[in-house]
A protein has these predicted regions:
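Hydrophobic faces of well-ordered beta-strands that scaffold small-molecule active sites
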Residues: 74-77, 104-106, 126-130
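Active-site-adjacent beta->alpha loops and helix N-cap segments on the catalytic face
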Residues: 86-88, 106-124
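An N-cap/entry alpha-helix motif that binds or orients negatively charged groups
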Residues: 1-70
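Conserved, mostly hydrophobic/aromatic
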Residues: 19, 76, 97
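Glycine-rich anion/phosphate-binding loops
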Residues: 84-98
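Glycine-rich phosphate/pyrophosphate-binding beta-alpha loops
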Residues: 78-84
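Alpha/beta enzyme core
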Residues: 81, 94-95, 119-120
Length: 130
């Protein structure tokens, strides 16, 4: 796969490249997966209105979330045990979120401490899952 154009492309690539145990953990939801299925169904229901022949020169995805300026209205959600995928997984994700101007949420099940993540991002604010 030379070009990734959607989340499904990433999932297919991960299934080929990531050890099975780690892939299964990341690709699944917890317990009965009811929230996972509900999220998938809700996501499928989102439709974007096409705007043809509209000047896009001054468009921006920037907005605010919880009073903070963000580059776009998305955030990295908490993912438990990200360190199973990469030893510094949470810190790398927090740095990426900072670089792209979006919020990062540290999981309660993180293998990295709040202090380590804060230091890794130069004290950049992030959210914490309680």
């Amino acid at each position: 796969m030379s070009v990734i154009t959607c989340i499904e492309d990433l999932r297919v690539l991960a299934e080929k490249r990531v050890p099975r145990m780690f892939y299964d953990y990341a690709d699944a939801g917890s317990w009965t997966e009811s929230t996972y299925r509900a999220n998938e169904a809700d996501f499928q229901g989102i439709k974007f209105r096409q705007r043809v022949a509209v000047n896009m020169d001054n468009r921006s995805t920037a907005t605010t979330m919880l009073g903070e300026r963000v580059a776009m209205p998305v955030a990295i959600a908490p993912t438990g045990l990200t360190g199973m995928q990469h030893a510094d997984g949470e810190m790398l994700a927090a740095r990426a979120a900072k670089q792209f101007g979006i919020p990062f949420t540290l999981s309660t099940m993180s293998i990295c401490s709040i202090e380590d993540v804060s230091e890794a991002t130069g004290g950049h604010p992030f959210w914490f899952q309680l």
